[in-house]
UniProtKB/Swiss-Prot annotation:
GO cellular component, as recorded: cytoplasm
Catalytically driven reaction(s): methyl (indol-3-yl)acetate + H2O = (indol-3-yl)acetate + methanol + H(+); methyl (-)-jasmonate + H2O = jasmonate + methanol + H(+); primary fluorescent dioxobilin-type chlorophyll catabolite + H2O = O13(4)-desmethyl pFDCC + methanol + H(+)
Protein name: pFDCC methylesterase MES16
Disruption phenotype: Accumulation of fluorescent chlorophyll catabolites (FCC) during senescence. No effect on root length when grown in presence of exogenous MeIAA.
Superkingdom of the source species: Eukaryota
Principal subcellular localisation of the protein: cytoplasm
Species per Swiss-Prot/TrEMBL record: Arabidopsis thaliana (Mouse-ear cress)
Length: 262
């Protein structure tokens, strides 16, 4: 956000994808926002989407989040954005919140990891994105005698865990575009030091009630441990609200940001 010469500032949303996804997953939502006169930007993190970097050589969260950090650092003076993070992309949002506090007017977590900087995540959240079945396949970029460097959901589980309420066309699209996520990038996402200034930025949590990957109990625990200023529930959404309920999600985003203008 931010304007020149007294002009009304244009609200600017920046979207951060979750594991294996990319900027492409926000296409429905950004279309709605752009048509309504807002500005939207979707970021491909390192090794995701159309990034040319192999996720197996992404070593930490700083490298993974570099495209997001570059975008924020290049914003004009006094220009602020609303960050929206999905799934484990919530960790990227929180890290950006700590590093670029003065560039962010609101942080929105969509079925996302939301851990307070300086806190220790609850043991109940240790398997936050893992189902009971063996739903993941791993890549070993440094050899099978070393820890895995990448992870991707097995094709037969994609619809159930990611897109159970989403249109089949979006499931088909996603199955062609998902990429292995860099495991090492996620190891330090929730290990940020305390940051009192970041705590002052309004946060919003949007729950997904029919989520087979990130269940309501875990989402509720995140909200309880670090209460946001606003909480919304998408009753008919699977893990990927940008596909299953884009118009409702659009309405909730507008409702959330309306509080900034009061």
């Amino acid at each position: 956000m931010g304007g020149e010469g007294g002009a009304e500032p244009v609200i600017h949303f920046v979207f951060v994808h979750g594991a294996s996804h990319g900027a492409w997953c926000w296409y429905k939502l950004t279309t709605l926002l752009d048509a309504a006169g807002f500005k939207s930007t979707s970021v491909d993190l390192t090794g995701a989407g159309i990034s040319l970097i192999d996720s197996n050589i992404v070593f930490d969260s700083d490298q993974y989040n570099r495209p997001l950090f570059s975008l924020l650092s290049d914003l004009p003076p006094h220009h602020k954005v609303i960050l929206v993070g999905h799934s484990i992309g919530g960790g990227s949002v929180t890290e950006a919140l700590c590093k670029f506090t003065d560039k962010i007017s609101m942080a929105i977590y969509l079925a996302a990891s939301m851990v307070q900087p300086g806190s220790i995540p609850s043991p109940h959240l240790s398997n936050i994105h893992v189902g009971e079945e063996d739903i993941w396949e791993y890549t070993y970029g440094e050899g099978t005698d070393k820890p895995p460097t990448g992870v991707l959901m097995k094709p037969e589980f994609i619809r159930h865990y990611y897109y159970s309420q989403s249109p089949l066309e979006d499931v088909t699209l996603s199955s062609k575009l998902l990429r292995p996520a860099p495991m090492r990038a996620f190891q330090d996402l929730d290990k940020l030091p305390p940051n009192p200034e970041a705590e002052k930025v309004p946060r919003v949590y949007i729950k997904t009630a029919k989520d087979n990957l990130f269940d309501s109990v875990r989402q509720d625990l995140l909200v309880e441990n670090w209460p946001p200023s606003q909480l919304y529930v998408l009753e008919d959404s699977d893990h990927s609200a940008f596909f299953s309920v884009p118009t409702t999600l659009f309405a909730y985003l507008l409702r959330a940001v309306s509080f900034l203008q009061r």
